[in-house]
């Protein structure tokens, strides 16, 4: 092959390699698109983005969109927000939506909201089109002991100024639930709540529950009201059952004490009987001693024996004539 031909082929190969490397590092088509859209951006700026590990189309495309919308946003602002981990496209879309809705929103504020983890585009849309939050059934007990369940619909609008650091929807729902329970609990009876559900919404709405949150409460509407359990009757029943158990326990305690006292009395009776038997055993000894010393005579001793015999005879008659019903009652 002719050396001149080889030289031409080598030059062509080198040119192809150089062009491939050039188009790899320099997004020419993106640069042309920016120029066609009227965005003045240097090709060296795009190369610098490559070197700073910034994907050029993630910055240039939102820049073109912002330029067409008439926003005063620079390349450095978008690139710095991208390097900070923000969503450049969502920020630009939020700025465009805010401009169309005549909402005052700067790029710095929008970028701060995005970096805080909030969906700034959704917040702008919610400022234009308020969101309805529906709570579950919230139960409260009126003063007459009847449980009342209420479901509310809360219409909120995003507060752009409080998106950073403001509480979310969960706080709104919790505060509204607390207000509903408090309003129902302060009602004299459940019929007032059923007759005038607006009383709940008006009372809750007047408490300023959106303080410190990222939302502004526009209205609170009671969607449904239902009657629950008779909590007062249940509590009274439980109290009566508890009182009954306490009374039974006290009665059982008194019965046990009575049984113990009865056993104690029986023991004392047996003790007294033992003492009587012991004393009776000493009587013959005392009589013998009296006879020995001459304190009593033989006739006195015989009279005593006759009296004992009469007493034993009367006891035997009494046992024979005792009423059987007395034995049944004792048994």
UniProtKB/Swiss-Prot annotation:
Classification via Pfam families: FloA (PF12127)
Localization of this protein: Cell membrane; Membrane raft
Observed effect of gene inactivation: No effect on KinC activity, a double floT-floA deletion decreases the number of proteins in the DRM, blocks the ability of KinC to stimulate biofilm formation. Single floA deletion has no change in FloT localization. Double floA-floT mutants have marked defects in cell morphology, motility, and transformation efficiency. Single floA deletion sporulates less well. Double floA-floT deletion makes no biofilm, has greatly reduced FtsH, sporulates less than either single mutant.
Protein known as: Flotillin-like protein FloA
Induction: Few foci are seen on rich media, when cells are grown in minimal medium more foci are seen (at protein level). Constitutively expressed in rich and sporulation/biofilm-inducing media, not controlled by spo0A (at protein level).
Coiled-coil parts of chain: none
UniProt keyword list: Cell membrane, Membrane, Repeat, Transmembrane, Transmembrane helix
InterPro entries for this protein: FloA (IPR022853)
Annotated region (Required for correct localization), positions in chain: 236-331
Motif (EA repeat 1): 240-242
Principal location: membrane
Gene: floA
Transmembrane intervals: 6-26, 28-48
Domain remark text: The last 95 residues are required for correct localization. The C-terminus determines the oligomerization state of the protein; there are many small foci for FloA. Swapping with the C-terminus of FloT leads to fewer large foci. N-terminally tagged, purified protein lacking the first 10 residues oligomerizes, with 12mer to about 50mer complexes found.
Family according to the record: Belongs to the flotillin-like FloA family.
Keyword rRNA-binding annotated: no
UniProt KW Transmembrane keyword: yes
Region of interest (Disordered), ranges: 312-331
GO cellular component: membrane raft; plasma membrane
Function description: Found in functional membrane microdomains (FMM) that may be equivalent to eukaryotic membrane rafts. FMMs are highly dynamic and increase in number as cells age. FloA and FloT function is partially redundant; double deletions have marked synthetic phenotypes. Flotillins are thought to be important factors in membrane fluidity, especially during periods of rapid growth in rich media.
Subunit: Homooligomerizes. Interacts with FloT. Interacts with FtsH midcell. Interacts with PhoR, colocalizes with PhoR in FloA-only membrane rafts.
Membrane-related topology note: Multi-pass membrane protein
Top-level lineage group: Bacteria
Motif extent (EA repeat 3): 278-282
Short motif EA repeat 2, span: 251-253
Motif EA repeat 4, residue numbers: 288-290
């Amino acid at each position: 092959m002719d050396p001149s031909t080889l030289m031409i082929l080598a030059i062509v190969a080198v040119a192809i390699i150089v062009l491939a490397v050039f188009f790899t590092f320099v997004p020419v088509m993106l640069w042309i698109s920016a120029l066609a859209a009227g965005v003045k951006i240097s090709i060296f700026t795009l190369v610098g983005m490559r070197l700073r590990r910034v994907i050029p189309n993630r910055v240039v495309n939102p820049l073109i969109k912002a330029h067409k919308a008439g926003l005063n946003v620079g390349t450095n602002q978008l690139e710095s927000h991208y390097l900070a981990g923000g969503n450049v496209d969502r920020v630009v879309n939020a700025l465009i939506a805010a401009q169309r809705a005549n909402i005052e929103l700067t790029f710095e504020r929008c970028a701060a909201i995005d970096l805080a983890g909030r969906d700034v585009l959704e917040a702008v849309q919610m400022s234009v089109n308020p969101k309805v939050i529906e709570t579950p059934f919230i139960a409260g007990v009126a003063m007459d002991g009847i449980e009342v369940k209420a479901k509310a619909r809360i219409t909120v609008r995003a507060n752009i100024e409080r998106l950073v650091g403001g509480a979310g929807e969960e706080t709104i729902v919790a505060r509204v639930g607390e207000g509903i329970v408090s309003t129902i609990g302060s009602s004299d009876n459940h019929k007032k709540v059923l007759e005038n559900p607006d009383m709940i919404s008006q009372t809750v709405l007047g408490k300023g529950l959106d303080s410190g949150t990222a939302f502004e409460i526009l209205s609170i509407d009671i969607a449904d009201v239902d009657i629950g359990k008779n909590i007062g009757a249940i509590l009274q029943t439980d109290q009566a059952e508890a009182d009954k158990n306490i009374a039974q326990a006290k009665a059982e305690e008194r019965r046990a004490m009575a049984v113990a006292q009865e056993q104690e009395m029986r023991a004392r009776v047996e003790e007294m009987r033992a003492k009587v038997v012991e004393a009776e055993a000493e009587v013959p000894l005392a009589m013998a001693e009296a006879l020995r010393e001459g304190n009593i005579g033989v006739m006195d001793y015989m009279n005593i024996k006759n009296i004992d015999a009469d007493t034993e005879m009367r006891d035997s008659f009494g046992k024979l004539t005792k009423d059987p019903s007395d034995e049944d009652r004792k048994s």
